[in-house]
Amino acid sequence: MTNESRKRKVRGSQIRSSRGDKKQGRSQSRDDKEIERLERQNDARGQESSTHVDEGFVPEEQSFIETESVNRVESRMERWLDVGRPVHLIGPTGCGKTSLAMHVARERDRPVVWINGDAELTTSDLVGEYAEKERISEHDQFIHNVVKSKDIIRDRWVDNPLTLAVQEGATLVYNEFSRTKPVANNVLLSVFEEGVLELPGKRGKSRYVDVHPEFRTILTSNSVEYAGVHEPQDALLDRLIGIYMDFYDLDTEIEIVRAHVDKSADTNVEDIVRVLRELRERLDITVGTRAAIMANEGATTVDTVDQAVLTDICTDVLASKVAQRSDVRGLREEIESAIDDMEVALS
């Protein structure tokens, strides 16, 4: 017996694919090719709309005041954005972080994408997920009076803000960044370091997205002593440029408040801003520029603002910051004392 014949001889049973397995494999291969063909066909017809940046979900631009103090912080932010570094604005609530972030983002003349962080935000909320069903259809009437129809229904991936910003080269404004749990923000590590966004949960070769060279990020956070603030992990903080903000100087705050109130009723703006700044020093609660804007809005509803009216207005504006009703009395007394000590001349 030759070696060739010995090699061909097989003892025992052989394991072969069943006819059913072979048929199923051929069927699966045909289905995959059919889906690819229909996708190309639908793309050519424009049946599938691509996701793109929609700035309709970005907060409207508010009046923005340019002063020396504002320009100083703005220039620092732009310096780092110009070299592609993400900027993290940190400061007390109501000091103007969000307004400044939105202004700087719009000045870049690129699309702006907005995210508002909170404890319930997940990685999927940032990058996207399979959240819809799509139908791929083919209708063929090659023969007269004979219509061939085929529908394939499958999961459809929906891009969320971070993915859209990365793809389009937009400026991402991530407001209240530190209110999001750190695990959800892990996806930012590869974006800032390797220039690649990984889409957890996405299948196939499109799981990775190259970061557009014009993509930039501005994050805003309250200081860590505020309730509901999570401290980001060191690996991420190591890749951020941190710029700490405080409340603006008196002249800047006056100009900001004037820009937000009726011009015909701004005679008390300076006095009210001074009172709120004094309360900022005296009280254990945060008294921001936003509180001064609200107080001046309240003052525009009366003909004359005397000390009693101003006390009521300031108490109403700040009462939501105290823990319980019994604390309001002490708050009111502090406000009355500050107004008396400053000898505010109201009209």
Curated annotation (Swiss-Prot):
Q: Give the catalysed reaction(s), semicolon-separated.
A: ATP + H2O = ADP + phosphate + H(+)
Ranges of Basic residues composition bias in the record: 1-11
Enumerate the Pfam families for this protein: AAA_5 (PF07728)
Q: Which Gene Ontology cellular component terms are annotated?
A: cytoplasm; gas vesicle
Q: Where in the cell is it found?
A: Gas vesicle; Cytoplasm
Question: What is its induction?
Answer: Maximally transcribed in late log phase, probably part of a gvpC1-gvpN1 operon. Gas vesicles appear earlier when grown in static culture, possibly due to O(2)-limitation.
Which Gene3D superfamilies does this UniProt record tie to the protein? Answer: P-loop containing nucleotide triphosphate hydrolases
Q: Which domain of life is it from?
A: Archaea
Keywords recorded for this protein, A-Z: ATP-binding, Cytoplasm, Gas vesicle, Hydrolase, Nucleotide-binding, Plasmid
Quote the function comment for this protein: An ATPase that functions in gas vesicle formation. A minor component of the gas vesicle, also found in soluble extracts. Probably enhances gas vesicle formation. Gas vesicles are hollow, gas filled proteinaceous nanostructures found in several microbial planktonic microorganisms. They allow positioning of halobacteria at the optimal depth for growth in the poorly aerated, shallow brine pools of their habitat. Expression of a 9.5 kb p-vac DNA fragment containing 2 divergently transcribed regions (gvpD-gvpE-gvpF-gvpG-gvpH-gvpI-gvpJ-gvpK-gvpL-gvpM and gvpA-gvpC-gvpN-gvpO) allows H.volcanii to produce gas vesicles. A similar region restores gas vesicle production in H.halobium without the p-vac locus, but which still have the c-vac locus.
Protein family according to the UniProt entry:
Belongs to the CbbQ/NirQ/NorQ/GpvN family.
Quaternary structure, from the entry: Forms homodimers, forms a GvpN1-GvpO1 heterodimer, interacts with GvpC1 (via the latter's C-terminus) and GvpL, might interact with GvpA1.
Designated name of the protein: Gas vesicle ATPase GvpN1
